[in-house]
Amino acid sequence: MDARISPLAAFAALALLLPFAREATAQACSFTAAGDRFAQLLVDAGLPGGAILVGDRQGLLHERYFGTYGPNTVVPIASGSKLVSGARILQLIDQGVIDPAAPVSTVLPQFTGEKGTMNVLQMFSHTSGYGDDSGDPLLFDRTISLEQAVDEIACCRPLTAGYTVGGQFSYGGVSMHIGGRLAEVASGEDWQAGWQAHLGAPLGITTIDWQAFGATTNYSIAGGARSNLRDAGRLMHLLVNDGRSNNRRLLSPATVARLTVDAAAGLPVASAPPGVTPPVMYGVGSWLDGLGGNLRRPQFVHSLGAFGFFPWVDFGRRLFGVFMVRGSGGINAQTIPAYRDMLTAIETELAGGSCDWIERFDEIFVDDVETL
């Protein structure tokens, strides 16, 4: 009888033993400093509640609700929608449904002239030639469809004065609106239904939709989504785990890596939200920094929303999280310094020793195991 053990069998045996070894020496971290700072933020901002979620590739490390918030609390996530929408665009690129370099006119021929030359990556990185237009009423008109809104943009919304396609970074919402309609036409599916079928359902997500401000089919791609804490966390886990979650591969690692490519590098900054400080770094629907251009976290991506909702992924540390509040306009003058402090406190606690998971994910976490 051959007593040799194959490498795959040895790995499987080790995978069974490792959780028990960790559980014997580790316990859940309390993240007290981060929680205290968050609680102070809620008091200072006069907010009724909030929530914190922190995890890594293998499971959840911390989940806590404050005040009136609980597991069923759903809030508008404002610009947190950009990363949520960007994940669907990346999936369609991965599947070959969207060519990331193709001009928009190849799918939406109503876009002509220079604005017909922008591509979907430019649309989702604020480098398309549109921008400084987050408050355009067309994006939030619930009486029309996404198709009608984008036809109006093609007809009657020129590029922002003085802008060129690919010539500057200018934060806004119109270009992502166009990208959402491009996705509908290329895939043959309604935006919201497609997202829910191909990302939401496989991940067990039930609360994410684009109805944050009332029933509509004019989905505000860049700012109209809503979510509870756990569902946003499920999507962040997919990203931190290189496109695999809930025992499903939904994105390739190479496609997820696009999130950390700085599309704004070398471009003049024509407009940016309040509180954003140089250097401005932006990927696909997400900022590339640790809040305020903190270069200690060059592989940190986030999509902070105007109401304070903060989904984030730290690819360098293999962590993800969601800080959940629902404030009013201007709240981020208070959330940004608080979130900086919370991230530092979380990193410090994790660096101090092993933190056990409060919930394990049923996954295999070994690079390239799928190629064996």
Regions inferred by a protein language model and the residue ranges of each:
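Sec/Tat signal peptide C-region and signal peptidase I cleavage site
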Residues: 20-26
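Short, well-structured active-site flanking segments
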Residues: 91-109, 186-211, 247-253
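Active-site-proximal loop and beta-strand segments within enzyme catalytic domains
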Residues: 45-48, 69-172, 189
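Bacterial N-terminal signal peptides
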Residues: 9-19
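Ser/Thr-rich, Pro/Gly/Ala-heavy low-complexity intrinsically disordered linkers and tails
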Residues: 361-372
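Catalytic-site signature segments of enzymes, centered on catalytic residues
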Residues: 65, 74, 134-233
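Catalytic loop of the DD-peptidase/beta-lactamase superfamily, centered on the K-T-G motif
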Residues: 27-64, 72, 184-189, 197, ...
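Active-site SXXK
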Residues: 38-39, 52, 58, 75-101, ...
